[in-house]
């Protein structure tokens, strides 16, 4: 009987040792898993923030491009409309063609003149 008791006691010690080692291994594995998850979460957050910033920047660029295209299109339509109204007025005899020959400065010409004035004022010290 003593042999059995001693054998079971040794086996019990082995099981207890294995359980302790298993518990320690599981704890270490849990810590490493937590570290890994936190690392992935942090990197994912950085990537999301960077992606959102990138998308916002591209959206802003596209909005600017669209607005420039719209302004250009509106200017073109306005110019063509004025030309057609002038043609109709001349054709119907309401206005003489010579009366329409007065050149109207374009917005670009006016902007260039304004820039030149600012440059001259800057050179002269604002006097």
UniProtKB/Swiss-Prot annotation:
Q: What does this protein do?
A: Plays a role in neurofilament network integrity. May be involved in modulating axonal architecture during development and in the adult. In vitro, increases the susceptibility of neurofilament-H to calcium-dependent proteases. May also function in modulating the keratin network in skin. Activates the MAPK and Elk-1 signal transduction pathway.
- The sequence repeats extend over 20-30, 31-41, 42-56, 57-67
Q: What is this protein called?
A: Gamma-synuclein
Q: Which residues carry this modification: Phosphoserine?
A: 67, 72, 124
Q: Provide the species name.
A: Bos taurus (Bovine)
Q: Which family does it belong to?
A: Belongs to the synuclein family.
Q: Which UniProt keywords apply?
A: Cytoplasm, Cytoskeleton, Phosphoprotein, Repeat
> Where does this protein have compositionally biased stretches of type Basic and acidic residues?
110-127
Question: Which intervals of the chain are annotated as region Disordered?
Answer: 99-127
Assembly and oligomerization: May be a centrosome-associated protein. Interacts with MYOC; affects its secretion and its aggregation.
* InterPro entries attached to this UniProt entry: Synuclein, Synuclein_gamma
In residue numbers, the region (4 X 11 AA tandem repeats of [EGSA]-K-T-K-[EQ]-[GQ]-V-X(4)) covers 20-67
Q: How is it modified after translation?
A: Phosphorylated by BARK1 and GRK5.
């Amino acid at each position: 009987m003593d042999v059995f008791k001693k054998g079971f006691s040794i086996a019990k010690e082995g099981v207890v040792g294995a359980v302790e080692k298993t518990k320690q291994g599981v704890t270490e594995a849990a810590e490493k898993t937590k570290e890994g998850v936190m690392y992935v979460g942090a990197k994912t957050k950085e990537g999301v923030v960077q992606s959102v910033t990138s998308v916002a920047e591209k959206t802003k660029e596209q909005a600017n491009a669209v607005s420039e295209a719209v302004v250009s299109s509106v200017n073109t339509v306005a110019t063509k409309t004025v030309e057609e109204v002038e043609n109709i007025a001349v054709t119907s005899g309401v206005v003489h063609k010579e009366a329409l020959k007065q050149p109207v400065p374009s917005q670009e010409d006016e902007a260039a003149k304004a820039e030149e004035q600012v440059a001259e004022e800057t050179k002269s010290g604002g006097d």
